């Protein structure tokens, strides 16, 4: 559509065929009477966030809001920066809401979501808090949905009136298994990487190779590059 041309023309790169098709799938779904329920699956670096941005822009052009929930603050911040870069040049205001923000920062963001100042919210579990309200939430995007509980996903969806749902996953799942895990979702697969994007290599090692893995990371740090270590969140239990 003419409205989406503004989005495509503003991108600093050309979408892959798979990305273009996935966005068109989302738009077609959202134009139907029943809400969209779609899974976008693709390797790390395949451009799933660009697809989410396209869907969010379509929702914005129709006067509504979108929310993207990520399982960690690191991922939420990455999505926020990416979506902000894609959408704010088009006048779409994007907000970040995470648990580590100050009470004042959270208050300002929540006020902006409730009065419609922000069209897109990106965050962690902070999005599902009772004090987080939206003016007109029409699209809920979940990154790695299996990392969230049923109640958390339902809580976010309940902040809109039967909103459209888009799930993003980098986990390579066979189609039949995806239907078992995610339910009755339509599926879009990103089959190629954007031009110039290097494939991301993933390795799994046992505890016996931990020191070797750390040395591997240190080699890149010594070259001036960056890295991070993510661990499962645990509650500290103090002896009584």
Task: Tell me the role of every PLM-derived stretch.
Residues 238-240:
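N-terminal low-complexity segments that are often proline-rich with Ser/Thr-Pro
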Residues 2-38:
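Conserved pre-motif I regulatory segment
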Residues 1-2, 236:
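Serine-centered coil/turn micro-motif
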Residues 24, 35-236:
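Inter-lobe coupling/hinge segments of SF2-like helicase ATPases
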């Amino acid at each position: 559509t003419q409205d989406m041309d503004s989005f495509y023309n503003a991108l600093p790169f050309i979408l892959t065929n798979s990305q273009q098709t996935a966005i068109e799938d989302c738009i077609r779904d959202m134009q139907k009477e029943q809400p969209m329920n779609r899974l976008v699956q693709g390797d790390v670096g395949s451009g799933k966030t660009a697809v989410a941005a396209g869907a969010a822009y379509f929702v914005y052009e129709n006067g509504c809001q979108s929310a993207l929930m990520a399982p960690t603050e690191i991922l939420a911040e990455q999505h926020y920066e990416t979506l902000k870069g894609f959408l704010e040049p088009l006048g779409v205001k994007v907000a970040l809401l995470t648990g580590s923000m100050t009470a004042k920062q959270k208050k300002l963001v929540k006020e902006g979501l409730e009065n419609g100042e922000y069209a897109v919210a990106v965050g962690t579990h902070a999005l599902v808090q009772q004090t987080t309200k939206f003016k007109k939430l029409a699209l809920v995007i979940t990154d790695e949905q299996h990392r969230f509980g049923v109640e958390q996903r339902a809580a976010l969806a309940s902040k809109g009136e039967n909103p459209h749902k888009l799930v993003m996953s980098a986990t390579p799942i066979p189609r039949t298994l995806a239907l078992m895990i995610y339910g009755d979702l339509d599926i879009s697969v990103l089959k190629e990487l954007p031009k110039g994007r290097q494939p991301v290599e993933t390795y799994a090692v046992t505890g016996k190779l931990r020191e070797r893995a750390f040395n591997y990371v240190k080699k890149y740090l010594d070259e001036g590059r960056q890295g991070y270590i993510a661990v499962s969140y645990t509650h500290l239990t103090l002896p009584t």
